[in-house]
């Protein structure tokens, strides 16, 4: 074979091998970096732009797509120990003509974390209101979506600032009082009684604990590679002391039943979405809300756990779009493609 041809194949093979080897090395040595790159790439692909806004010396980090228009803007509040990017799987299936805003909740990701901050549910509600005011998002009433802890905050926000919100989607929200405790809550109470707050199931510190948390929060049993589990843990470990402080605050007497105590004040059209197999917050919470919120509708998803947004993103997006169409434009029966 001609020497030039051999050289060409060697160069081509080397060119292909370098990025492949770099990827493999990154996967094995720095899985957390790959996870960050993954979110960056997904945001870019979906057209979500990251911005910062300040209220005095407090910084909020958020991502957005689109501009305010004749349709209500949509503000999305994530759950405990998550971040704004958890909504990307749903954003993928939402129409491009909606103005979407996903904010990092107080102390999370790019939003200020202060030891002086009030992390109670009401404290978080007031912070989110500051964010809304900074963006002037309430120049026209907007649609508010929250899941888990974010659902608790969203519901209380709608009760505290009714003129800001035109409609509401609560996805397996926390903050309700049940007649009986499920197994997860019983376990939390046992930990509380034994003062073993270092072993909160939602705050993993090893790949094994991360795997257990994923199984707790999901009905679908994902087969997650060990390196990805390690990467997920590596991303969280620097923040675990904050997560522990936040968790103890939101399950304290001050915040534990915040949504329950305010649900009768919610007057806007409300959509309640819940996974039937939720092991963290029992699906019976949907009926509790529906009985108290007059203008509400319930959507229970079969074969779905607590992580509704991650397990059923397409269905969640469809339910939200159809709900918005029915509430704000009854003549429009637009369906998702």
Swiss-Prot record:
Residues 30-337 are cytoplasmic. Its EC number is 3.1.1.23. The active site is at 148 (nucleophile), 278 (charge relay system), 306 (charge relay system). Pfam families: Abhydrolase_1 (PF00561). The chain crosses the membrane at residues 9-29. Signal peptide: none annotated. It is found in: Late endosome membrane; Lysosome membrane; Mitochondrion membrane. Keywords: Endosome, Hydrolase, Lipid metabolism, Lysosome, Membrane, Mitochondrion, Signal-anchor, Transmembrane, Transmembrane helix. It comes from the Eukaryota. One of its GO terms (molecular function) is monoacylglycerol lipase activity. Residues 1-8 are extracellular. GO terms for cellular component: AMPA glutamate receptor complex; GABA-ergic synapse; glutamatergic synapse; late endosome membrane; lysosomal membrane; membrane; mitochondrial membrane; mitochondrion. It is a single-pass type II membrane protein. One of its GO terms (biological process) is monoacylglycerol catabolic process. It catalyses: Hydrolyzes glycerol monoesters of long-chain fatty acids; 1-octanoylglycerol + H2O = octanoate + glycerol + H(+); 1-decanoylglycerol + H2O = decanoate + glycerol + H(+); 1-dodecanoylglycerol + H2O = dodecanoate + glycerol + H(+). Lipase that preferentially hydrolysis medium-chain saturated monoacylglycerols including 2-arachidonoylglycerol. Through 2-arachidonoylglycerol degradation may regulate endocannabinoid signaling pathways. Also has a lysophosphatidyl lipase activity with a preference for lysophosphatidylglycerol among other lysophospholipids. Also able to degrade bis(monoacylglycero)phosphate (BMP) and constitutes the major enzyme for BMP catabolism. Belongs to the AB hydrolase superfamily. PANTHER family: MONOACYLGLYCEROL LIPASE, MONOACYLGLYCEROL LIPASE ABHD6. This is Monoacylglycerol lipase ABHD6. It comes from Rattus norvegicus.
């Amino acid at each position: 074979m001609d020497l030039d041809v051999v050289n060409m194949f060697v160069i081509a093979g080397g060119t292909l091998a370098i990025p492949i080897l770099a990827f493999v090395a990154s996967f094995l040595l720095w899985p957390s970096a790959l996870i960050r790159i993954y979110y960056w790439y997904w945001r870019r692909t979906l057209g979500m732009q990251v911005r910062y806004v300040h209220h005095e010396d407090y910084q909020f980090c958020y991502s957005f797509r689109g501009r305010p228009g004749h349709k209500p803007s949509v503000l999305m509040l994530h759950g405990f120990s998550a971040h704004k990017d958890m909504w990307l799987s749903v954003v993928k299936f939402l129409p491009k003509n909606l103005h979407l805003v996903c904010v990092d909740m107080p102390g999370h990701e790019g939003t200020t974390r202060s030891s002086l901050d009030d992390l109670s549910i009401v404290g978080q509600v007031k912070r989110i209101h500051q964010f809304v005011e900074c963006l002037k998002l309430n120049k026209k009433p907007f649609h508010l979506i929250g899941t888990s802890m974010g659902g608790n905050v969203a519901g209380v926000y709608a009760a505290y600032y009714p003129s800001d919100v035109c409609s509401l989607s609560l996805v397996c929200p926390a903050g309700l009082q049940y007649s009986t405790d499920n197994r997860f809550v019983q376990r939390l109470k046992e930990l509380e009684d034994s003062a073993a707050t270092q072993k909160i199931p939602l705050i993993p510190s090893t790949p094994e604990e991360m795997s257990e948390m994923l199984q707790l929060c999901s009905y679908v049993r994902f087969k997650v590679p060990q390196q990805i589990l390690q990467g997920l843990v590596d991303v969280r470990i620097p923040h675990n002391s904050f997560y522990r402080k936040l968790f103890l605050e939101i399950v304290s007497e001050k915040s534990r039943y915040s949504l329950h105590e305010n649900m009768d004040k919610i007057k806007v059209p409300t959509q309640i979405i819940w996974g039937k197999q939720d092991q963290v917050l029992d699906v019976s919470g949907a009926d509790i809300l529906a009985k108290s919120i007059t203008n509400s509708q319930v959507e229970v998803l079969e074969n779905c756990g607590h992580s509704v947004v991650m397990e059923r993103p397409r269905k969640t997006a469809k339910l939200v779009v159809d709900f918005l169409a029915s509430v704000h434009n009854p003549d429009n029966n637009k369906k998702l493609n």
